[in-house]
């Protein structure tokens, strides 16, 4: 990337840490995630696609149904420093009606960019296990399928976070 500050911050010499092969990739900006998706022949999901994957067609509040169940998501981290995210597929009982895993509670997920004539922002979905106490900048959790965060995009180095990753989609043919 043009601005590599904090890019893949947990990685060393181009490699993820030992034992991290199944964890979400974090410390990537929206541009980084888009570049990877394009390289892989995919793209980032539109917000409505993420919503459909999480909610299905029956309007459920959470990917698994309408009743909150903390055992279906990673345990919250309320400390000052973040632990590593959970492995992908670590919570299979939290799958959506389409069997999509880890839609909520592991890391926030980039969706395609939101832009109007005044603002450049991105819609973030899924919420994160990281829930710092007393933080004035970190937006509240969004576990429900009908909740999201909106992040004002400043510069790639500011947009990268250990609590923010992405997933890719591919158009059906």
Annotate each predicted stretch with a short phrase.
Residues 6-150, 157-162:
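Functional-site microenvironments in short loops/helix caps that host divalent-cation chemistry
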Residues 162-173:
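Short, structured beta-strand segments at or near domain termini in extracellular proteins/domains
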